[in-house]
From Swiss-Prot:
GO terms for molecular function: iron ion binding. It comes from Coxiella burnetii (strain RSA 493 / Nine Mile phase I). HAMAP family: Fe_traffic_YggX. GO terms for biological process: cellular response to oxidative stress. Could be a mediator in iron transactions between iron acquisition and iron-requiring processes, such as synthesis and/or repair of Fe-S clusters in biosynthetic enzymes. This is Probable Fe(2+)-trafficking protein. The lineage of its organism: Bacteria, Pseudomonadati, Pseudomonadota, Gammaproteobacteria, Legionellales. Transmembrane segments: none annotated. Coiled coil: none annotated. The keyword Glycoprotein does not apply. Keywords: Iron.
């Protein structure tokens, strides 16, 4: 049976994640309050950030930037798109 939660990002009941996707307390917070659908939306947004800003994941500053953007996206007011960004769908 799939675990259901009230997703903090979506503001509605949704399927929960099957495992903690991130280490530490933040990972537990994500596991307990963020749905699979919201997590997938974050992964897509994260990919866009990595590509648009040409981030190297071996750079500690890039990882710190992505972690802060993840917190903003999942729990805050949202993560901003890079200036001038337009998706292929638009």
């Amino acid at each position: 049976m799939t675990r259901r939660i009230i997703c903090q990002k979506l503001g509605k009941e949704a399927d929960a994640l099957n495992y903690s996707p991130y280490p530490g307390e933040l990972g537990e917070r994500i596991y307990n309050h963020i749905s699979e659908q919201a997590w997938q939306a974050w992964l897509s947004h994260q990919t866009m950030l990595i590509n648009e800003y040409r981030l190297s994941l071996i750079d500690p500053k890039a990882r710190q930037f992505l972690e802060q953007e993840m917190i903003n996206f999942l729990f805050g007011t949202g993560s901003e798109k890079p200036a001038g960004y337009t998706s292929e769908k638009e």
